[in-house]
């Protein structure tokens, strides 16, 4: 019974490790939306806490819900361009390709997700190359072994043939004189 308990515990260990790895990967993959509010302050992200960000904005030409960002938000977006949400008086980011997050600060690990066809072709080619290298390696190792076996087999045949044939001495003449 003790052995059965150990086996069931050992088989659940890989399952638990896989579950933990899945949770870690899921945490890294989940992307935040492009929010412009800080969760700690729940307010606007200004340089000074006392500064009124909405009061310092300059009204530029308005195109729908968004306008150009004020100069104080020039470097707000890390890998993208800034736009200002007029209704909320907050900055927002439009991230470059391959970046995600509120300020485009994270690299999107699944950026090349749409190129599955190319990834599949590359994987198939890699598997075929590995298979060819494996076959060449096996053939290279087996060929000398086969030669050695053939040589040993020939030597053994020569020995057995030599033992089966009784040597005839030509110097001695056979006579039927009894």
Swiss-Prot record:
The keyword Cell division does not apply. Glycans are attached at residue 34. Disulfide bonds join 69-82, 77-93, 95-104. The chain crosses the membrane at residues 119-139. The keyword Lipoprotein does not apply. GO terms for biological process: cell population proliferation; epidermal growth factor receptor signaling pathway; epithelial cell apoptotic process; ERBB2-EGFR signaling pathway; ERBB4-ERBB4 signaling pathway; negative regulation of epithelial cell apoptotic process; positive regulation of cell differentiation; positive regulation of cell division. Residues 32-118 are extracellular. Keywords: Cell membrane, Disulfide bond, EGF-like domain, Glycoprotein, Growth factor, Membrane, Mitogen, Secreted, Signal, Transmembrane, Transmembrane helix. Residues 65-105 form the EGF-like domain. GO terms for cellular component: clathrin-coated endocytic vesicle membrane; extracellular region; extracellular space; plasma membrane. Synthesized in several tissues and tumor cells. Predominantly expressed in pancreas and small intestine. Residues 112-178 form a propeptide. One of its GO terms (molecular function) is receptor ligand activity. InterPro entries: EGF-like_dom. Residues 1-31 form the signal peptide. Residues 140-178 are cytoplasmic. It comes from the Eukaryota. Monomer. Interacts with EGFR and ERBB4. Growth factor that binds to EGFR, ERBB4 and other EGF receptor family members. Potent mitogen for retinal pigment epithelial cells and vascular smooth muscle cells. This is Probetacellulin. It comes from Homo sapiens (Human).
């Amino acid at each position: 019974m003790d052995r059965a308990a150990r086996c069931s515990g050992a088989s659940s260990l890989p399952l638990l490790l896989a579950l933990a790895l899945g949770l870690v990967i899921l945490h890294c993959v989940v992307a935040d939306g492009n929010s412009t509010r800080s969760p700690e302050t729940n307010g606007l992200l200004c340089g000074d806490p006392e500064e009124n960000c909405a009061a310092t904005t300059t009204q530029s030409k308005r195109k729908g819900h968004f306008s150009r960002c004020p100069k104080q938000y020039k470097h707000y977006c890390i890998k993208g361009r800034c736009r200002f949400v007029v209704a909320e008086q907050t900055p927002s980011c439009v991230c470059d390709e391959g970046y995600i997050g509120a300020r485009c600060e994270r690299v999107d690990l699944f950026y090349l997700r749409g190129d599955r066809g190319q990834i599949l072709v590359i994987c198939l080619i890699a598997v075929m190359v590995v298979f060819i290298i494996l076959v060449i390696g096996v053939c290279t190792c087996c060929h000398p072994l086969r030669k050695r076996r053939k040589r040993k087999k020939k030597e053994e045949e020569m020995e057995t043939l030599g033992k089966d044939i009784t040597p005839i001495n030509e110097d001695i003449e056979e006579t039927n004189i009894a």
